[in-house]
């Protein structure tokens, strides 16, 4: 294979999956085939999309009801020659799913890149091992928390929140994705003030915390804003990838003047991936493509919290982020939304140690504040790694958290 193989879920009311697959393969490449003169067929053969696989799936009554017609469901695989497109994500996505995305009844499940094509993508700069080296934490999941309620607040408020989270043992604190450039907490001021706080906590408590600052602005200003952040001392850049595009992420990741990890936020991605019938699958969008384009971290809805993905989907995202690939470093999985300490055993059981446990209200809503919330999570992580049930741990901060949010992991076996 020298090009790319696209895997689709299709719904066909003509009940002829083979014909539908061939129509897609031709429609996204040379347009027609059977009516072409033999000589022209020979000339265009190397550009023709090739149907590799057609598999019929069981009928699904809910799908028929939603589409208001009876359809045949199937999985098809089509190979697109590398000759047809330039080796960049805009060209790849337009080739494999451009006008086809308007069909409304086709979902792009996966893209399989040839080794030759993979060479054109950077992958994560740091990856899991690089992030762990920055923090000198190698034997447990990382803990991340989020600034809450920062809109309309000043730098002093930010510093207080940051200090409490760091003292609580949080490894990474990230901006809220809706915190943009503003007069009260400008980008460089946040970074400089944040570093002062984190250095003070490190000197006093010996705990290192990294700050992920939200890089925002117009598309053609992003690189300059990212470089300003780096010059001010940014540890990590948070980036709302899908508000801009995967190619913009790749551009930031490839820039040698932006030598810091990039954390990809999934904002807007639901517009592409939420439907089971059409769009782009979450594992492809939030897993494989983010990793290839250069994200060191990928945030996505966890299977447990308030904005839940199905467990199978969430684990598939993580698989794409962390599976061995000689071309790319591994990216951190960050299952998010509605996470509290009682979910920690689930997260470690399902995602392993190479995961970032990300909490907002589960830290800030603790009765002992963010310090208590962070400590509750750290205790839950340590207990889980020691195979100790959370309800047996004698720790006031963890006990308080379990009293408030419950302990759904009571029967979890690791």
Curated annotation (Swiss-Prot):
Cofactor(s) the protein requires to work: Mg(2+)
Protein name: 2,3-diketo-5-methylthiopentyl-1-phosphate enolase
InterPro entries given in the database record: Diketo-Methiopentyl-P_enolase, RuBisCO, RuBisCO_lsu_C, RuBisCO_lsu_C_sf, RuBisCO_lsu_fd_N, RuBisCO_lsu_N_sf
Keywords noted in UniProt: Amino-acid biosynthesis, Isomerase, Magnesium, Metal-binding, Methionine biosynthesis
GO biological process, one term: carbon fixation
GO molecular function: 2,3-diketo-5-methylthiopentyl-1-phosphate enolase activity; magnesium ion binding; ribulose-bisphosphate carboxylase activity
EC category: isomerase
Modified residues (N6-carboxylysine): 174
Source organism per UniProt: Bacillus anthracis
Family per record: Belongs to the RuBisCO large chain family. Type IV subfamily.
Enzyme nomenclature, EC number: 5.3.2.5
Subunit comment: Homodimer.
């Amino acid at each position: 294979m020298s090009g790319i193989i696209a895997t689709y879920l299709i719904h066909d009311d003509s009940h002829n999956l083979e014909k539908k697959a061939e129509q897609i393969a031709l429609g996204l490449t040379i347009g027609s085939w059977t009516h072409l003169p033999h000589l022209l067929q020979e000339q265009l053969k190397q550009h023709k999309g090739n149907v590799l696989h057609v598999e019929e799936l069981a009928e699904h009554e809910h799908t028929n009801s939603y589409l208001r017609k009876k359809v045949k469901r199937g999985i098809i695989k089509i190979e697109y020659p590398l000759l047809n497109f330039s080796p960049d994500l805009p060209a790849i996505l337009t080739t494999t799913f451009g006008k086809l995305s308007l069909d409304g009844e086709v979902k792009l499940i996966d893209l399989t890149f040839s080794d030759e094509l993979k060479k054109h993508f950077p992958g994560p700069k740091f990856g899991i091992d690089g992030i762990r080296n920055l923090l000198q934490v190698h034997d447990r999941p990382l803990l991340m928390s989020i600034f809450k309620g920062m809109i309309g607040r000043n730098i002093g408020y930010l510093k207080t929140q940051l200090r409490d989270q760091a003292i609580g043992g949080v490894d990474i604190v990230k901006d809220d994705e809706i915190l943009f450039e503003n007069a009260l907490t400008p980008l460089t001021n946040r970074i400089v003030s944040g570093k002062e706080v984190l250095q003070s906590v490190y000197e006093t408590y010996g705990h290192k915390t990294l700050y992920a600052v939200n890089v925002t602005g117009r598309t053609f200003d992003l690189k300059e804003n990212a470089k300003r952040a780096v010059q001010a001392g940014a540890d990590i850049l948070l980036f709302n990838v899908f508000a801009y595009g995967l190619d913009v992420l790749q551009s930031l990741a490839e820039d040698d003047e932006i030598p810091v990890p990039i954390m990809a936020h999934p904002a807007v991605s639901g517009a592409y991936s939420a439907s089971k019938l059409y769009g782009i699958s979450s594992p492809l969008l939030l897993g494989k493509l983010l990793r290839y384009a250069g994200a060191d971290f990928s945030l996505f809805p966890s299977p447990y919290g308030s904005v839940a993905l199905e467990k199978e989907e969430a684990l598939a995202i993580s698989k794409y982020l962390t599976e061995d690939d000689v071309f790319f470093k591994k990216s951190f999985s960050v299952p998010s939304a509605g996470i509290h300490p009682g979910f920690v055993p689930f997260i470690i059981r399902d995602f392993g140690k190479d995961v970032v446990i990300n909490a907002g209200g589960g830290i800030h809503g603790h009765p002992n504040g963010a310090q208590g919330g962070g400590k509750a999570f750290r205790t839950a992580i340590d207990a889980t790694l020691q195979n100790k049930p959370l309800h047996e741990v004698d720790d006031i901060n963890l006990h308080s958290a379990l009293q408030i949010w419950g302990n759904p992991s009571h029967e979890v076996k690791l």
